[in-house]
Amino acid sequence: MLIDWILKNIMDMDQEDQSGKTQWTKYYLTVYFSGLFNLLMILILSVLFGTLSETFIVYVVLIFLRPVAGGWHAKTKWLCRLESIVIYVAIPFVLKNSSVSLPFIYKILLMCLLVVLFYWYAPQGTAIEPVQPSDLNVLKKQSLIRVCLLILCSLFVKEKIASVILYGLVIQGLMILPVTKNLIEGSVFMKFGKKIIKNVIEKRVAKVSDGVGTKPRLNQNSPNIFGQWMGQTEKPKKNIEK
């Protein structure tokens, strides 16, 4: 594995070492290369689907807002990649090839709604990246300033570009809403997937044990098959040794 090779040959760290420093280094390398892979994947797909400019605008909007507004993250690499494809390529492709446009009055209402949304929910911290109370007001002000700047920009550019900017604002707004947390993180899909796998296994076990005796039940403490298959990467606890 590339990360293990880097730890051993470049960072001069033992990959079997369970100390905090090694685990944190491995975690951040995993995040870095996962992000790099996603970026290359999005770039290639945007070129293939002819959405390079739209994808770039959405990317700039989210990069501009996310550091101060925060927001939910997908819990698995595969879900993150799927959401990235939808957000950066699929929907921009639809916007580019659609002739439908919002009337100006609806755009103004949407802009006002976005300002209220960011005022109310930004910054949105997570368990991995919590917002410190001392930073709350500063980040909220920065979020509102950046949202207002993007809204002003959308008023002085071509309609197609303005639509993409507003779309990026809407996406970032959805990422900080409490009601979208389970959807974006993938908890809904994980729960649904585990239920399907459990039902399938129970049916197969029931067929095998049919006529033999009492129908066996799955152990409630059995490993999380679905979570392991998805390959979720957990952030190590803060136990770095000085």
From Swiss-Prot:
Compartments in which it is found: Cell membrane
Keyword set includes Transmembrane helix: yes
Membrane topology: Multi-pass membrane protein
Any single Gene Ontology cellular-component annotation: plasma membrane
Keyword Transmembrane belongs to the record: yes
Biological process (GO), any one: proteolysis
InterPro entries: AgrB
One annotated GO molecular function: peptidase activity
Pfam entry (one): AgrB
Disulfide bonds: none
Superkingdom assignment: Bacteria
Chain segments annotated as transmembrane: 29-49, 52-72, 78-95, 100-120, 160-180
Keywords: Cell membrane, Hydrolase, Membrane, Protease, Quorum sensing, Transmembrane, Transmembrane helix, Virulence
Family: Belongs to the AgrB family.
Role description: May be involved in the proteolytic processing of a quorum sensing system signal molecule precursor required for the regulation of the virulence genes for gelatinase (gelE) and a serine protease (sprE).
Protein name, UniProt field: Protein FsrB
Species assigned in the record: Enterococcus faecalis (strain ATCC 700802 / V583)
Gene that this sequence comes from: fsrB
